[in-house]
Amino acid sequence: MLMWGLTGPIFGTIADKYGGHKAISIAFLFYIAGIYFLFSGPNTGIYFQISLGVLIGIGCGGTAISIPMAVVGKHFPLSNRTIAMSFVTAVGSFGYFLSPIFTNYSLQNHGWVQTLIYFMFFLIVGLAISYFVRSPSLNQSTETTNKQNSLSALKEAFKTKSYVLLIAGFFVCGFHITLVGTHVPKYVIDRGLEDWTAAMILSLIGLFNIFGSLISGYLSTKISKKIILSVIYLLRGVSICLFIFTPPSTISSIIFGASFGFLWLSTVPATSGIVAHIFGTKFLGLLYGLVFLSHQIGSFFGAYLGGLFYDLYGSYDYAWYLAIALSIFAGLIHLPIIEKPVLRLKEEPVLRLKTE
């Protein structure tokens, strides 16, 4: 999670400066190498950490949602940018829905080595497709008015209160997602439910996130994005409360999987849309990459603290209480965000594709 987050801004900078296909292609090479060494290397802890933790972590930094989101965002004007971004999230969610189903089938029928080979093949296909990714360029007359570099873009962003609030809010998003994704399987078993219930919850999350992302993207063109984010985070707290305070059952698990899935990554179109609206799209890869770094730091703590609380107290209760408190925190801190472009930003230009 941390390597994924730390390399996101680096790949974002590469995408901003040299083009999206270069950043994504480099990341795919790391990802493929990590998968290859995972099934072909020695079965030792350090080798496992290098392949899975470092190489695959770096690969995720450039192939996961933040970089494709930034690349797509550059192609669309403000009026429909968040809708376009929501489609990126929705397609990724469809993969999240299919992945556990395919993985479980392949592990049972072919074993883990062959399963990893299948995944490596999928990544090679992704590498080939990434060659066709193209970034837009501004028309020449407008490029001369925007002489910002990466450093000045960072200084401007961190002097902007709304950007800092977005970073804090996305930390909570990462905490929620990894707490649920990592610890719900153990939690539902501890409550006396079958292990297939956990797989069902995760699959429902992936499925309903498709709809949540698309609806969030559409609503972001109609109403304030900060209000959408506040509502999403507060509803996450409600969903968690209903899940942990109602008697365990298959029905309650289905309701939680569907409701939390609807809210899962529906934060992404609105969050990335605010970043693009405030600062423009020239350094969207870098600036959104840093917001996503906060998300991954939150993911680290969601996974770590969930396990720590369980080891200390023998239950996940305190982890869930913290998640609910963070929902309230995130719901409130988005309200002061000002959804207006910085004074530097000129009228957004018409984009045209360039051949890289």
Predicted regions and their residues:
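Helix-to-loop junctions at the C-terminal end of transmembrane segments
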Residues: 7-19, 213-224, 311
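C-terminal ends and interior cores of transmembrane alpha-helices
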Residues: 29-43, 235-248
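Hydrophobic core of transmembrane alpha-helices in multi-pass small-molecule transporters
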Residues: 46-63, 171, 252-266
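Flexible cytoplasmic inter-helical loops of multi-pass small-molecule transporters
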Residues: 135-152, 343-351
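Extracytoplasmic gate region of multi-pass secondary transporters
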Residues: 155-216
